[in-house]
From Swiss-Prot:
Any one GO MF annotation of this record: structural constituent of ribosome
InterPro entries reported in the protein's UniProt record: NA-bd_OB-fold, Rib_uL2_dom2, Ribosomal_uL2, Ribosomal_uL2_bac/org-type, Ribosomal_uL2_C, Ribosomal_uL2_CS, Ribosomal_uL2_dom3, Ribosomal_uL2_RNA-bd_dom
Name used for this protein in its record: Large ribosomal subunit protein uL2c
UniProt-annotated location(s): Plastid
Annotated organism of origin: Prototheca wickerhamii
Gene: rpl2
Length: 273
C-alpha cells in the first residue's frame, strides 16, 4: 500500500500524508457484523478522567472481528478487504461454506478470492490459523493466543509480526515485535503471516485537526501549567521543575521509572537474553 502526498496548498496539506486506499474493496461494511459504538472519552463509569488527552473524534461503527477463529475445519473465501476505523490493520470479510460471514485481520498478501481455513492440519499459507505445535520454526505469525481458546491477543496491529524461534515441552518461544522473547503454550493458536497495512507507521498527520479526528486531545506539558494543576507548574518564565526528578500529575516518579509489578506471574514466561 503506497503513501499519497498532496500539493502544498495549505500547511496541513504540505506536511501531511495519507495511505492509498486503491487496494480496498469499494463496499459498505457488512451490516450484521457492525454495531454502534459509544466512546468512553477517557472516563470511567463515574465520569471521572482515567486516561487523559482523550475525547471527541469522528463517529464510528464498530466492526466485530473474529480473533478466535473457532470454525475448525471449515474453509472460507475472502470476499473483500476493507478499512476499519477502530484499528490500524485492514480487515478481510470471509464467507464460510455454510454461508456465515466473519471479519478477520487481513495479513500481507491476502487477496480477494483466496481461501483461508482454521485447522490443526491446515497448510502453512498466509491467513490460515493453526496451533503452535503444528507451525514450523521460523514461521512468521500474528494474532497469537496467550491461553488456548481465549482468542488472539498478541501481534494484531498494522505491520506487526512474531516469529517462532524454539519449541520445548509444552512451550513455544516467540520473538515478539517489542523484541521480547516469550513462552507461549504450544496449544495456543496463531495465524500465519504478517499483519497488513505495512506503511501505516510512515504516514504523517500534518495538522492538529487529524489528531482530533482520532480522539487525541492536546498533551500539555506540566511545566506549562500553574502550580495548582501540576507539580511541575509555576515559576517565572521557563523555570525548572524544582525537584530532584520528574514526577507525574499525582506526584509519583515518572520518566524512566519501571512501572511493572516485580512479582507478576508472567515474569516467568519472559526470557531475558
Amino acid at each position: 500500500m503506497a503513501i499519497r502526498f498532496f500539493k502544498p496548498t495549505t500547511p496541513g496539506r504540505r506536511h501531511g500524508s495519507v495511505l492509498n486506499f486503491d487496494d480496498l474493496s469499494s463496499k459498505k461494511p457488512e451490516k450484521k457484523l457492525t454495531r454502534g459504538w459509544s466512546r468512553a472519552q477517557g472516563r470511567n463509569n463515574k465520569g471521572r478522567i482515567t486516561t487523559r488527552h482523550r475525547g471527541g473524534g469522528h463517529k464510528r461503527l464498530y466492526r466485530e472481528i473474529d480473533f478466535i477463529r473457532n470454525k475448525i475445519g471449515t474453509s472460507a473465501i475472502v470476499k473483500s478487504i476493507e478499512y476499519d476505523p477502530n484499528r490500524t490493520a485492514r480487515i478481510a470479510l470471509v464467507c464460510y461454506k455454510d454461508g456465515e460471514k466473519r471479519y478477520i485481520l487481513s495479513p500481507t498478501g491476502l487477496k480477494v478470492g483466496e481461501m483461508v481455513i482454521a485447522s490443526p492440519n491446515a497448510p502453512i499459507t498466509v491467513g490460515n490459523t493453526l496451533p503452535l505445535y503444528n507451525i514450523p520454526l521460523g514461521t512468521s505469525v500474528h494474532n497469537v493466543e496467550l491461553q488456548p481458546g481465549a482468542g488472539g491477543q498478541l501481534v494484531r496491529s498494522a505491520g506487526s509480526v512474531a516469529q517462532i524461534v524454539a519449541k520445548e515441552g509444552q512451550w513455544a518461544t516467540l520473538h515478539l515485535p517489542s523484541g521480547e522473547y516469550r513462552l507461549i503454550p504450544q496449544k495456543c493458536w496463531a495465524t500465519v503471516g504478517r499483519v497488513g497495512n505495512l506503511d501505516n507507521s510512515n504516514i504523517t498527520l500534518g495538522k492538529a485537526g487529524r489528531s482530533r479526528w482520532l480522539s487525541q486531545r492536546p498533551h500539555v506539558r506540566g511545566s506549562a501549567m500553574n502550580p495548582v494543576d501540576h507539580p511541575h507548574g509555576g515559576g517565572e518564565g521557563k523555570a525548572p521543575i524544582g525537584r530532584a526528578r520528574p514526577v507525574s500529575l499525582w506526584g509519583k516518579p515518572a520518566l524512566g521509572v519501571k512501572t511493572r509489578k516485580r512479582k507478576k506471574f508472567s515474569n516467568n514466561l519472559i526470557i531475558n537474553l
